[in-house]
UniProtKB/Swiss-Prot annotation:
Pfam families: Adeno_E1A. Interacts with host UBE2I; this interaction interferes with polySUMOylation. Interacts with host RB1; this interaction induces the aberrant dissociation of RB1-E2F1 complex thereby disrupting the activity of RB1 and activating E2F1-regulated genes. Interacts with host ATF7; the interaction enhances ATF7-mediated viral transactivation activity which requires the zinc binding domains of both proteins. A motif (LXCXE motif, interaction with host RB1 and TMEM173/STING) lies at residues 97-101. A zinc finger (unnamed) spans 150-170. The keyword Transcription applies. Disulfide bonds: none annotated. One of its GO terms (biological process) is symbiont-mediated suppression of host JAK-STAT cascade via inhibition of STAT1 activity. This is Early E1A protein. A motif (Nuclear localization signal) lies at residues 246-250. It comes from Human adenovirus F serotype 41 (HAdV-41). Residues 102-122 are annotated as: Disordered. One of its GO terms (cellular component) is host cell nucleus. Keywords: Activator, Early protein, G1/S host cell cycle checkpoint dysregulation by virus, Host nucleus, Host-virus interaction, Inhibition of host innate immune response by virus, Inhibition of host interferon signaling pathway by virus, Inhibition of host STAT1 by virus, Interferon antiviral system evasion, Metal-binding, Modulation of host cell cycle by virus, Modulation of host E3 ubiquitin ligases by virus, Modulation of host ubiquitin pathway by virus, Oncogene, Transcription, Transcription regulation, Viral immunoevasion, Zinc, Zinc-finger.
């Protein structure tokens, strides 16, 4: 440690402060406010004294011909005067941007599809008009096929907007939810003032089956019968059982 100089044995703060004080910053000159743009022309000494010969004269003349220098000078003068000189010979022309090209004629299949589509639209519109006209009235109907051609179903479909809607009667007939039997004709089919009697509804149940009747028990044997129905009939010879008498002994 004795061999080291005092500069390295001091405190690091003192050493850093000494380094900062020892440095001298470079004083750069401030740039001029009016900085001139340097072009490629300024890199070559084009204008020389006639007495001195320039070895690069031919190369410079080949790189910058006289016509290029004259155009550059005219552009600089035009920009300085405020007239660029561009667009002086332009004339206002009205352009028609409409396309007059005709497309290919439609094929036969496309024409048929267009006609079918138009017919479907017409039928849909007519159906909508018919539904709209009869939307204010609800008429009960009973078609052969439930849900098809029913005026009540059309009313519900037009009012709800659901094409699969059905009236309650067609729904019950289609699903067999209840036993259905027509009571009267559909509205509109029978004329007013007719004296014809309406048909009575068909019977909902078949003929009741014959049930056996209870018979009194007797000790006497019954005679032979030809069929089981004979057993269900009352035997006129049967007498009521007298409970006051003693039961006969069986041999």
């Amino acid at each position: 440690m004795r061999m080291l100089p005092d500069f390295f044995t001091g405190n690091w703060d003192d050493m850093f402060q000494g380094l900062l004080e020892a440095e001298h910053p470079f004083d750069f000159p401030e740039p001029s406010q009016a900085f001139e743009e340097i072009s490629l022309h300024n890199l070559f000494d084009v204008e020389l004294d006639e007495s001195e010969g320039d070895p690069n004269e031919e190369a410079v003349d080949g790189m910058f011909p006289n016509w290029m220098l004259s155009e550059d000078h005219s552009a600089d003068s035009g920009a300085a005067s405020g007239d660029s000189g561009v667009g002086e010979d332009l004339v206002e022309v009205n352009l028609d941007l409409k396309c007059y090209e005709e497309g290919l004629p439609p094929s036969g299949s496309e024409a048929d599809e267009a006609e079918e589509r138009a017919e479907e639209e017409e039928t849909a519109v007519s159906n909508y008009v018919n539904i709209a006209e009869g939307a204010s009235q609800l008429v009960l109907d009973c078609p052969e096929n439930p849900g098809r051609g029913c005026r009540a179903c059309d009313f519900h479909r037009g009012s709800s907007g659901n094409p699969e809607a059905m009236c309650a009667l067609c729904y019950m007939r289609l699903t067999g939810h209840c036993i259905y039997s027509p009571i009267s004709d559909a509205e509109g089919e029978c004329e007013l003032g007719s004296n014809e009697e309406t048909e009575l509804p068909c019977s909902l149940t078949a003929t009741a089956p014959v049930r056996p009747t209870p018979c009194r028990v007797s000790c006497r044997r019954r005679p032979a019968v030809d069929c089981i129905e004979d057993l269900l009939e009352e035997d006129p010879t049967d007498e009521p059982l007298n409970l006051s008498l003693k039961r006969p002994k069986s041999s």
